[in-house]
UniProtKB/Swiss-Prot annotation:
Phenotype of gene-disrupted mutants: Impairs the formation of preautophagosomal structures.
Family note: Belongs to the ATG5 family.
Job of this protein: Involved in cytoplasm to vacuole transport (Cvt) and autophagic vesicle formation. Autophagy is essential for maintenance of amino acid levels and protein synthesis under nitrogen starvation. Required for selective autophagic degradation of the nucleus (nucleophagy). Also required for mitophagy, which eliminates defective or superfluous mitochondria in order to fulfill cellular energy requirements and prevent excess ROS production.
Record bears the keyword Lipoprotein: no
The name this protein goes by in its record: Autophagy-related protein 5
Keywords: Autophagy, Isopeptide bond, Membrane, Protein transport, Transport, Ubl conjugation
Main subcellular localisation: membrane
Gene Ontology CC terms: Atg12-Atg5-Atg16 complex; autophagosome; mitochondria-associated endoplasmic reticulum membrane contact site; phagophore; phagophore assembly site membrane
Organism ancestry: Eukaryota, Fungi, Dikarya, Ascomycota, Saccharomycotina
Family annotation (Gene3D superfamilies): 3.10.20.620, Autophagy protein Apg5, helix rich domain, Phosphatidylinositol 3-kinase Catalytic Subunit, Chain A, domain 1
Length: 271
C-alpha cells in the first residue's frame, strides 16, 4: 500500500509542447519550436510555464513581459485549465489511452502534445494566471479549505495551521518531500473521524461533478457512487484515478486514502 502511494506521488507524464502557429517565428522547424518536458502528475501546469516559455523564447515572435501573464496551454485547439492536477487533465483529455486487459497498452506512453499560446484574450474557461506561484499557492490553499470543510465540517484546521506548518506544506509539494507533506496533512484530518470525502468526478463530456460522499457508508463502491450521481455504472467504460484503471467495485474510502491529490480531493475520470 505504501509503495503504491509513493508511486502515485512520483508519477510523471511525458509532454511535448509546441509553440502555437499564431506566435511562432515564421519558418521555424518543428524541432526548434517544440520542447519535451517531464511533468509530475500531482502538480499544476502553472509550475512548468516559466520553464517552457524560457526554453522556447527564441522561437516566439510576440513581445511579452511575464512568464505567466497572457500565457496558456491548449490541447487540440482547446484551452487547458491550470487549476487541476496535471495527471487529472491528462487522463481526461488523452484520447489515445486504451486498456488491454488489466494493463495499459503502449499508447499510454505516448507524449501528451500541448500547444503554448499567448494573447490578451484567453479561451473560454481559462483562469488567467497573472501572479505566478503566489496565485497557484492561494488557489491551492482555497482548495484545501474546501477539502477540510467537507472532511471535518469546517475549515478551521487549515485556517489554524501555523505559518511555518503551512509554508512547509506548500514547499513539500515543490520539493516533492512526501514525508513532510503527509506530516502536515495529518494535522488537517483523520480518516477515522472524517464526515465526508472530497471527491470530484469528471464525465466523458468534460463536466466536473462534486458529489456528497458521507463516510458513514465505508463500503461505498465506485459503481454505487456513479449511480448516485446519475452516471450509470453500466454506461461507463472505464474509471481512471491517477492514471490507473480502477474497478467499479473498488471501495471509495480506500481509494481516497491511497489516491487523494495534493489539493485534498480524489479525482475520478470516467470514460
Amino acid at each position: 500500500m505504501e509503495e503504491l502511494r509513493e508511486r502515485v506521488w512520483n508519477g510523471t507524464i511525458n509532454v511535448e509542447v509546441v509553440v502555437s502557429d499564431a506566435i511562432v517565428v515564421p519558418n521555424t522547424t518543428l524541432a526548434d519550436k517544440s520542447c519535451h518536458i517531464v511533468m509530475l502528475r500531482d502538480a499544476y501546469l502553472g509550475f512548468y510555464l516559466p520553464t517552457v516559455v524560457r526554453k522556447l523564447a527564441d522561437t516566439i515572435k510576440v513581445p511579452y513581459e511575464s512568464d505567466y501573464r497572457n500565457w496558456w496551454f491548449e490541447y487540440n485547439g482547446e484551452g487547458v485549465p491550470w487549476e487541476y492536477p496535471c495527471g487529472v487533465l491528462f487522463d481526461l483529455l488523452n484520447k489515445k489511452r486504451k486498456k488491454q486487459g488489466n494493463e495499459l497498452d503502449d499508447t499510454s506512453l505516448q507524449m501528451w502534445e500541448l500547444q503554448l499560446c499567448h494573447g490578451d484574450k484567453y479561451p473560454r474557461g481559462i483562469l488567467p494566471l497573472v501572479d505566478g506561484h503566489s496565485q497557484i499557492k492561494d488557489y491551492w490553499r482555497h482548495q484545501w479549505k474546501q477539502a477540510c470543510f467537507i472532511l471535518n465540517g469546517s475549515a478551521k484546521r487549515i485556517m489554524s495551521l501555523s505559518i511555518p506548518d503551512f509554508e512547509n506544506f506548500w514547499v513539500s509539494i515543490l520539493s516533492r518531500n512526501r514525508s513532510d507533506f503527509m506530516a502536515v496533512r495529518s494535522k488537517l484530518f483523520s480518516m477515522n473521524k472524517a464526515k465526508s470525502l472530497p471527491v470530484r468526478v469528471w464525465t466523458s463530456n468534460y463536466a466536473v461533478l462534486q458529489p456528497t460522499v458521507p463516510v458513514t457508508d465505508k463500503e461505498l463502491s465506485v459503481a454505487e457512487l456513479l449511480d448516485s450521481i446519475k452516471l450509470s455504472s453500466d454506461g461507463v467504460k472505464s474509471v481512471i484515478i491517477q492514471g490507473i484503471d480502477v474497478s467499479i467495485e473498488d471501495n471509495i474510502f480506500e481509494l481516497y486514502d491511497i489516491f487523494a491529490s495534493i489539493d485534498g480531493f480524489l479525482y475520478l475520470v470516467t470514460k
